[in-house]
Amino acid sequence: CSHSKAHATMNPTYPTHKVKGWIDKAIEGDKNYYELKFTLDDNPYVPDEYKQRIRDSLSGVFYKRNYLGLWCLAEGAIFDFFDKKIHVLRKPPAAAEYYIAAIDYGASNPFACVLIGVSTGQYTQEGKKLWVEREYYWDPQVTQRGKTNSEFAKDIVEFLEPYNVRSLYIDPSAAAFKREMQRVGITTIDANNEVLDGIQMTVSEMQQGNLYVLEGCKNLIKEIETYVWDKKKAEKGDDEPVKKNDHAVDALRYAIATHKVSVYKPYKHQEIADEWRRNKYDHYRK
């Protein structure tokens, strides 16, 4: 039909996306296409506090796309804001109310497990805090020896035994190892393995000052510092990290993307209702 119309709204993604081609036609003067561009700053009804919260939660390509509204490639360092002086601690920032853990399984590749302390803010009144307290990391290329699933299971049981671990998340594809963990009495939970969403959530938590790493986690720190976007895949429209030296950081991503922290909020009933109304659609609230 010559009078058919289509209306669409979206956040920008990679610049070779088909929708970007339609927008380019509008910019070039094709009267069959019309573009309206708005950013969060154009909305007069959004409080400045909310805008600042979103700015603080975004970094790199996520900030450029989701806040500035730019069509850009995912390139460079993923944790481009990472600073050892800020994000690496000698001791936990709070007392752990409980722990979670996550595993990135590897046989010929490194096997990584991270132990994460969680504070909901109940005792600190400072909101949630998460920190990677310890890491288990076995690299068969370095040790020149692989391990069986039963050996890994024994190691993980000993690694986690001293702690109040509420949940253990694992790569969903590690079926045989999950069965071995079940055999030794440990229940595992399939992790959310949506890579881009997991990266964005992990970056956001660290950017907002909710997520830290203790200095003893040498492998994780090294991986965070060298975790980069795959430029060749980005040019083809695929937002993916380089699959190299990413085992501990993948385990961290599993935990952050899957576990929901119930933040302690000691408000009165009316204050809770007001907070709910203010934040009903605020997906970036702490």
Regions found by a protein language model. Give the residues of each.
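ASCE P-loop NTPase helicase motor core
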Residues: 1-58
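ATPase catalytic-site recognition across NTP-hydrolyzing enzymes
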Residues: 44-105
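Short beta-strand scaffold segments in enzyme catalytic cores
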Residues: 110-117, 253
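Short, glycine/acidic-enriched loop or turn micro-motifs at the edges of active sites
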Residues: 107-108, 174
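Mg2+-dependent endonuclease catalytic cores in nucleic-acid-processing enzymes, primarily RNase H-like
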Residues: 125-243, 262-266, 275-286
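Short loop/turn segments immediately following beta-strands, especially the blade-tip
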Residues: 117-123
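A residue-level signal for conserved active-site and pocket-lining positions in enzyme catalytic cores
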Residues: 9, 38, 67, 104, ...
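Short, hydrophobic alpha-helical segments
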Residues: 255-263
